Amino acid sequence: MINQNEYQRDYVRVLIIRADIDKNGLAYSKAAEINDLIECFRLLKNGFLAYSTLGELLKTFSKYTNGNEDLSQKMKRLRNKLDFMNHLRNKCTGHLDDILIDKAIQWEPSLFTKQVVESEHHIYLIYKTLLESAINSYMDENGGQKYFHMEIDLFYPPNWNDFINFMAESQVDSMDFLDDLLSEIKKNLRLIDDCDDLFLQAAIASKTDFRLPKKGR
């Protein structure tokens, strides 16, 4: 049995993730359209975080799929995309680890040519190469790229289109899933609809203790 606290928490989670995916998607798509690729790569890095968060919450949200085959199938279709997004977030946004950077430098030796280092476009090439390295390091058990099934070079237009299409499909599928999930939650969400109830909740609010428990204690 799902209680009101769970419904409220999940409602907040869904609204935040949905808004982030929507606004980030519009922003990096617009940047790509006007060929502002530095801004596009920067926004993509931010965009991975919302998808990664959604992936981490699928287990929490799975309780809403019981008896709802359509929502269950939408969640299943998202899993592979969100697993890939989580990898990109970890490698390209959350952790700038030594191994990935070393792979990026090996993959793009021109990063440290004098001409490139002194160019105003140096950061663009760094963003691009780190993203490629993160994409290509998402491997299956045979050492092949796990999602695209080929090595990706974002300077190669078909590869760039494949990646942008992946991001667009991920946005559409995620928004569709989140909209359906939101509808399920709202059916059971008890809203404050009279002054007496509001005053009661305000009294409870005045007793809020903002100290958070320490982990491991």
Please annotate each region the language model reported:
Residues 1-84, 99-102, 108-111, 117-217:
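Amphipathic alpha-helical interface segments
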Residues 87-90, 94:
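Long, charged low-complexity segments
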